[in-house]
């Protein structure tokens, strides 16, 4: 027997479709003022030694004995202040969802400190979190964002039997790791869409590769 949360999750899906579209959140659906939100690196004494933007964090290698401070990335208030919608990508998400309900947001973030405040901000920008599930890959405890998303999407493929999976992400590392799922699922098509957003012009460039 499934619980109520699982029931709501299944209601979002189209069981007839074997295609999943997964969207990264930061720098794909929302651009951020990097002066307002960063991941901080602390040394073994708890002293802040470095601050990373979302894009820098994606490829950062944590030195031995150091740790990450995600407090700004877990703050719903900071998200509301720093996030600017990338309208072309949000429109794309909504258009795909209209025809195929199997659309999810897969973010490297973990749980936000104010779930309802975060959901309210998403809805304000046209994304209904009751319709589009937000997978928080940061909760997996994986060593990197790429490995975390690899695990989350791999689990979804196993659970729902998807035959075509699309990932829209601004990190090439994340996309390369995503395509490596082909080794475990040779009968599945993996479409990696690299998203480059230029805030000065509002231009979005998509580059697609396939595994």
Locations of regions flagged by a protein language model:
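Alpha-helical substrate-recognition element adjacent to the catalytic core
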Residues: 15-143
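Extracytoplasmic/secreted proteins, especially bacterial periplasmic and envelope-associated proteins
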Residues: 88, 113, 117-120, 148, ...
């Amino acid at each position: 027997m499934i619980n109520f949360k699982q029931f709501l999750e299944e209601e979002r899906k189209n069981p007839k479709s074997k295609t999943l579209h997964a969207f990264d959140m930061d720098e794909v659906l929302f651009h951020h003022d990097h002066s307002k939100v960063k991941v901080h690196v602390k040394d073994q004494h708890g002293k802040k030694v470095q601050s990373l933007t979302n894009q820098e964090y994606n490829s950062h290698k944590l030195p031995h004995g150091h740790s990450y401070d995600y407090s700004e990335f877990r703050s719903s208030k900071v998200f509301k202040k720093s996030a600017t919608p990338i309208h072309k990508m949000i429109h794309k998400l909504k258009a795909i969802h209209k025809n195929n309900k199997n659309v999810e947001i897969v973010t490297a973030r973990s749980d936000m400190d104010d779930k309802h405040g975060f959901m309210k901000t998403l809805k304000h920008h046209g994304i209904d979190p009751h319709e589009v599930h937000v997978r928080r890959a940061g909760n997996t405890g994986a060593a990197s964002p790429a490995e975390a998303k690899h695990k989350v999407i791999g689990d979804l493929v196993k659970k729902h039997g998807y035959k075509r999976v699309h990932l829209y992400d601004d990190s090439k590392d994340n996309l390369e790791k995503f395509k490596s799922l082909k080794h475990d699922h040779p009968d599945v098509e993996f479409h990696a869409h690299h998203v480059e957003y230029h805030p000065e012009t509002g231009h979005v460039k998509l580059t697609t590769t396939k595994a």
